[in-house]
A protein has these predicted regions:
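Mid-to-C-terminal alpha-helical segments outside catalytic/metal-binding sites
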Residues: 1-36, 50-106, 116-123, 132, ...
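Active-site gating/metal-coordination segments in enzymes
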Residues: 11-15, 19, 127, 131-132, ...
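Active-site neighborhood of phospho(di)ester-bond hydrolases with catalytic His/Asp-centered motifs
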Residues: 37-40, 135-136, 162-163, 188, ...
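Conserved, mostly hydrophobic/aromatic
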Residues: 41, 125, 179, 187, ...
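Histidine-centered divalent metal-coordination motifs
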Residues: 41-47, 220, 267
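Active-site mouth loops of central-metabolism enzymes
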Residues: 104-115, 160-169
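Short, well-ordered alpha-helical microsegments
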Residues: 142-146, 172-173, 272-276, 295-299, ...
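Catalytic pocket-lining loop regions of alpha/beta-barrel enzymes
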Residues: 185-186, 199-311
Length: 354
């Protein structure tokens, strides 16, 4: 097991956690057995493989590898911190051990997806008491994983999926029509991965078409790295550019233009959390998910806007599911709050009664 000493140190400080045989952290059953948990923000190889060039489209079935060790987050075990966004502290100097590790992980961390097969997802859901999950597709222009994901969700009642149409697709209308004949529960838009600004003309035109379907739209939102990291050479120039595509101020025109559309702004705004709280107060048609956010921020969300528009999500496989579950347990004060966040809000959206 990699990082065995450091992982056991984490266990000594968090009685709710244990280690699976592959070295990933999981929740102890005693702490989760009374809850129905729906992970509203997951990814899988099958839903994202089109983002990779053909030479890297390789599904890995080794369930003995810890996904936490392969992913971007935490940036290193030395930086692990359950009370921070991404459950990781952030280095501010490239020429340091953690700075170099972070730069490498920002480049290689996406390859954890090769191991995040449907079989692995279901296994990890079982380990963490998660009953159902929403898998979000992300597609480059003129490609999609609609048929593959349709076959998967049709064969497994524990899984749902959100469709993905790129704003630069040549025939957006036909893709939307095809998806609407599938069992999708909503739409996924990812500006920083797909290379467009959420408020650009093409994006707004796409959102208008998606809004007509009546399905909710989940968008990655907020600054994905803190300013103190962006001011260094740790991220590449392209990464620095891409993370700006979903700044929360860019969402103002989106939300003002489509006040009747149900949006889920993912990650609670990442490192723009305070701005997300204000945005949620202003726009009652907006939900958020708590993927990557620590307990302190989740507690603030509940105190400021209530628990009825907060969704449980993890951003699996990039973030260990147990950390987000533990964060909700620590942030909530009663069973009603936990029920809303873990499952009730998700059921409302998945059943179309929002």
């Amino acid at each position: 097991m990699k990082y065995k000493k450091k992982k056991y140190a984490v266990l000594s400080e968090n009685e709710e956690l244990e280690l699976a045989s592959n070295g990933d952290f999981i929740m102890k059953k005693d702490f989760i057995e009374n809850y129905e948990i729906i992970d509203f923000h997951c990814h899988s190889y099958e839903g994202l493989f089109q983002l990779f060039p053909p030479s890297l489209q390789k599904k890995k079935t080794d369930h003995n590898r810890a996904l936490m060790d392969l992913s971007c987050f935490p940036f290193s075990m030395n930086l692990f911190d359950l009370n921070k966004v991404y459950f990781s502290d952030c280095p501010t100097k490239l020429f340091s051990i953690d700075g170099v590790k972070t730069r490498i992980k920002l480049f290689t961390g996406a390859f954890v997806l090769n191991y995040a097969t449907i079989e692995r997802l279901l296994m990890d859901m079982d380990h963490n008491g998660i009953s159902k999950a929403v898998i979000h597709q992300i597609n480059p222009p003129d490609k999609n994983s609609a048929d593959i994901m349709e076959e998967i969700v049709a064969q497994n009642e524990r899984l749902y999926t959100f469709g993905s149409v790129h704003p630069f697709d040549e025939d957006i209308d036909s893709k939307i029509k095809h998806y609407m004949n599938c069992h999708i529960k909503g739409w996924k838009i990812n500006p920083h991965v797909c290379g467009f600004s959420i408020d650009c003309e093409e994006s707004l035109a796409l959102i208008e078409k998606l809004s007509r379907t009546g399905l909710p739209i989940l968008c990655c939102s907020g600054l994905g790295l803190p300013q103190e990291v962006l001011s260094t050479n740790i991220p590449s120039r392209q990464t620095k550019k891409d993370v700006m595509n979903q700044r929360l101020d860019k969402y103002e025109i989106v939300l003002d233009t489509f006040p009747e559309t149900t949006f889920i702004l993912a990650h609670s705004g990442c490192f723009e959390f305070e701005d997300m709280v204000n945005l949620l107060k202003k726009h009652p048609n907006v939900y958020t998910d708590i993927s990557i956010q620590p307990a302190g921020h989740i507690k603030t969300l509940i105190g400021e806007i209530g628990s009825e528009r907060v969704l449980f999500g993890t951003d699996y496989p990039f973030v260990t599911q147990a950390f987000s579950i533990l964060s909700v347990l620590r942030a909530t004060e009663n069973e009603e709050e936990r029920t809303f966040i873990f499952s009730k809000n998700a059921k409302r959206l998945l059943n179309g009664s929002f």
